[in-house]
Amino acid sequence: MATPITLAFAVLPILSLLVSPISCHGNPRPMSLRNYTTTSRYTTSSVPAKSAAGWSSGGATWYGSPYGAGSDGGACGYQGTVSQRPFSSMIAAGGPSLFKNGNGCGACYQIKCTGNKACSGRPVTVTITDSCPGGLCLAEAAHFDMSGTAFGAMASRGMADRLRAAGILKIQYKRVPCNYNGMGISFKVAAGSNPFYLAVLIQYQNGDGDLAAVHVMEPGGVWTPMQHSWGATWRANSNTGKPLRAPFSVRLTSGAGKVLVVRNAIPAGWRAGRTYRSTVNYYAT
């Protein structure tokens, strides 16, 4: 988790079908620790004001290295992938209205600033990968604590350091579809998973980006709902006292209710700590 400031994994055989998320009950929720310093403060109304173009008003700060990816992973559990493609450090920690107790993980937003002379006015796209639970993130209806890279990307050419020096910005933002350019959804079987318990971190969903529900099915079985564990991790337990049987098929339901079914997503012989990348994904629009 995070407080605003101013300022691989081994991929098992590529599956022809998606995988299914299930998550570890006992894993602690990761925290991103940040120092908080500002030169000025401002407040916004409790309800974001929307413009005619569909933009809403909010606030932004940044954290971590000026040219980095914020925290090393964040409260969604994406770990070092936040600095790698396709995220490429263009990420943000969301205040409560954006992080949504982890249900907002993976959602994409365009953000632009216009109230500072260093602002370019051009929108940048970020993915929610972390939580910002205090400070301005609580005081504002919508607040993005952005990576130094993403914050600086809102600046005019050669003005990134000047914009980061401002520390706090009024911004405009809107939700947009995620587009990972042909990448399939990946599923990382979490540490602690065993024959009776399966936990999976799910990422790189096109379109809505977030997930509202996940179901898993054993061979010849029925769809069983999985529980949201934390961040982008979902979990399932054996309800029969017998080991769970792979391969597992997975049914994903996005935040907007779009369903994607992946047959035989996680293979027999799966191992905790391994990532299985499918070759399918939601449409990006």
What is each of the regions a protein language model found here?
Residues A2-T285:
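Folded extracytoplasmic luminal domains of secretory or organellar precursors
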